[in-house]
Amino acid sequence: MCLVHDLGEAYEGDIPAVEQSDPAAKAAAELAAIDRITPLLPDEAAARIRALWEEYEACATPEARWVKALDKAETILQHNQGANPADFDYGFNLTYGAEWFRDDALLRELRRLLDAETARHVRR
C-alpha cells in the first residue's frame, strides 16, 4: 500500500506538505496517474493496485490508517533531518497529520518522538 500510494505521485511528483492546499485536486491528480499506469499491467495486478490506492485514500482500514500515519511521519522526518530554508517553520510539524497517530499506542509513541525532535528545532 505504501508503494501504491507513491505510484500516484509518479507523474505530478510529491507536493511538499507545506504547499498542499487542495486535497481533492491532489487526490484527483494521483488517481489520474494510477489510471495511466494500471492499463500497462495485467488486469488482476491493475485491479489490485487500484483497490489498494482506493483503500489508502479512504483510510477506512487499520492498514490504510497506519500507512497514512507513516507517510506523515516520513514528511516530518524529512523536515527534521533534511536541509530546509532558513525561515522554515518547524512548528508546522507539531500539528501536521497528528490525527493519524491517535488510535494506536505505537503510533502515539512514534509521534511523541517526532514531536520531541521537532521541538528541539523550534527552540533553536
Q: Where is each model-derived feature located?
A:
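Active-site helical microenvironments for divalent-metal-assisted chemistry
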Residues: 1-124
